C-alpha cells in the first residue's frame, strides 16, 4: 500500500529535492549570520560560547529545542572546548536555513493541493491534482495515498501529516 504513494508523481512532479551540492546561503544571509555571531563574540576572539548558541540562533529567527541544541553542540564542539567558531556557526545556520526553506516548500505544495483552503487535503483535492498532472490513478490508489498519510483517521491529510509523509518519502 505504501508503495502507491512513492511511485506516484502526484506529489513529486515539480517538488523534487534538489540533488547536488550542500545548501548555500546568499551573501545577504551570510552577512546576517555574521552579524548575529559578532553580536555574541564580544571579545573579538572569533568564537562564541556554546551557551550563547541558542541566543544567537534566536536572533536569526530560530527556536531550537533542547535536544536539537545538544545534538548541534556535540557536532560543532567536538573537542568540548565550550567555544564555537564562526565557520562552525555558519555551517549550523546554513543547515537550519535550508531545513526552514524545505518546510516552506512543502507547505507551498500543501496549499496547492488544499485549493478550497480547509487546512486539509481531501480525496477530492487529491483527485483534482492527479487529473491536472495527467496522472491516471484509480480512486482506490488515491484513497490509499490518503490512508497512508492520514494519521488521525479523519479521512483527510492535514499540514502536519503532509509534512511527515513528504519527509518520509524523501522527496525533500
UniProtKB/Swiss-Prot annotation:
Protein name: Centrin-1
Spans through the membrane: none
Alphabetized Gene3D superfamilies for the sequence: EF-hand
InterPro entries according to UniProt: CALM/Myosin/TropC-like, EF-hand-dom_pair, EF_Hand_1_Ca_BS, EF_hand_dom, RNA-helicase_DEAD-box_CS
Region described as Disordered: 1-30
Organism: Mus musculus
Biased composition annotated in UniProt, kind: Polar residues: 1-14
Database matches in SMART domains: EFh (SM00054)
Keywords: Calcium, Cell cycle, Cell division, Cell projection, Cytoplasm, Cytoskeleton, Metal-binding, Mitosis, Repeat
Oligomer status and interactors: Monomer. Interacts with CIMAP3. Interacts with USP49.
Gene Ontology CC terms: centriole; centrosome; cilium; cytosol; microtubule organizing center; photoreceptor connecting cilium; spindle pole
Similarity remark: Belongs to the centrin family.
